[in-house]
Amino acid sequence: MISPGKSWFVILITLGELALFGLLADAGDPDNIFLRGAQRPRPILNIAHAGAASLAPQNTLASGWKAFQIGADLWGVDTRLTKDGVFVLMHDGTLDRTTDVEAIFPERAPWRVGDFTVHELKMLDAGSWFVRTDPFGQIKSGEVPEVDQHAYVGEKIPTLREALEFTREHDWRIDIEVKVVDDVSKEEIAQQLVTLIEEAGMEVWVLVSSFDHQLLREVKRLDPRIPIAALVIVAPWNPVEYLEELQADVYAPSPVGFTSGFVARLGALGFGVHLWTYNAVSQLRQFVSMEGVSGIYTDFPQRLEPILDELFDVDAH
């Protein structure tokens, strides 16, 4: 049994924790829905992975537009630096899978992104591969109209600046996953990224994510308004302590990087928890019902959206 004196102490500590959480929740711009403790437009966010990647070429403005039309809360993009230091949207370290680089620059193998200038990248077709390979089988199933297929031919690789401008024009949000390269320092990458975000006026409309947590530390140091998400494969030994030390706002684990109890605990502490990447309707339904989950990355935002609408009946925009 707790003595009266100790009970008052426990109450004071509990109230102190609640007050701290309240400060976290009220801190910053109300539009900044990714900060730890912030209010979201709905309990779980529909995060279009590389845009609506099942319906349009990944990491293009076309896939972003599709995701926006569907009603996704944000789109997630991958970004890398070009030879001349420009951030562009590209998942792979090389260009051959998702562009016609082999035909345009046959002598430049292995076609690393960092070996090309942004001008050279703008010469490439980043859309035809999607029509040719139908990576998610959605063309075969009739989900991608012929008019869209024709429009994707010749689609260009966007710069991150263009993606930010597109997002801002549509009063939307974006998750920027930063791919780190060995020949550019993390400090330099972080400084250039933060400057670009600030110039675009997107500090509270972005989430910066990365597997490189030292880069995230630097982003947070440069501008505490910018939310950061720790991408992980396997959970850290002491996840809460680690995330607090990192000043992370969001924990983004792989399928082996979380348990239901752990997710619930993080959610109760105000951290966002974004799970990746799930496409099957059965998986989407399973994880939207998991306590503590605040976002799901999916290549099929068109599948997740009706599930969230059914649960929350809130207009994402």
Predicted regions and their residues:
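Phosphate-group recognition and catalysis centered on beta-loop-alpha active-site segments
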Residues: I2-H317
